């Protein structure tokens, strides 16, 4: 179920302050975050975030197409190794 429009997008408060500090400094450094649930806002465009996936920080460069999505969508938590091979076909 989608979030109510009258509530607005959810963003952790510390994330806004971190992004503001990086914008003011002018340096293009990776902002490490653990908040996968936060929504990407227009003021984050052009910044690079290190989104934690449970084991490491995955670098995510934000562009205009990502606005409105969550940070967690761009940092996969599971590694897919493919389906198991058919053992009968392997023996022959």
UniProtKB/Swiss-Prot annotation:
InterPro entries the UniProt entry points to: Ribosomal_uS19 (IPR002222), Ribosomal_uS19_bac-type (IPR005732), Ribosomal_uS19_CS (IPR020934), Ribosomal_uS19_SF (IPR023575)
Molecular functions (GO terms): rRNA binding; structural constituent of ribosome
Keyword Cytoplasm set for record: no
Cellular component GO terms held in the UniProt record: cytoplasm; small ribosomal subunit
UniProt keyword rRNA-binding, yes or no: yes
UniProt cross-references to PANTHER family, sorted A to Z: RIBOSOMAL PROTEIN S19P FAMILY MEMBER, SMALL RIBOSOMAL SUBUNIT PROTEIN US19M
Name assigned to this protein: Small ribosomal subunit protein uS19
Lineage: Bacteria, Pseudomonadati, Pseudomonadota, Alphaproteobacteria, Hyphomicrobiales
């Amino acid at each position: 179920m989608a979030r109510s429009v009258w509530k607005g997008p959810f963003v952790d408060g510390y994330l806004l302050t971190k992004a503001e500090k990086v914008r003011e400094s002018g340096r293009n450094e990776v902002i490490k975050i653990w908040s996968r649930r936060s929504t990407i806002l227009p003021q984050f465009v052009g910044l690079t975030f290190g989104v934690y996936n449970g084991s490491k920080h995955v670098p995510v460069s934000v562009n205009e197409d990502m606005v409105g999505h969550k940070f967690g969508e761009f940092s996969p938590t599971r590694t897919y190794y493919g389906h198991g091979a058919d053992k009968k076909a392997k023996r022959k």
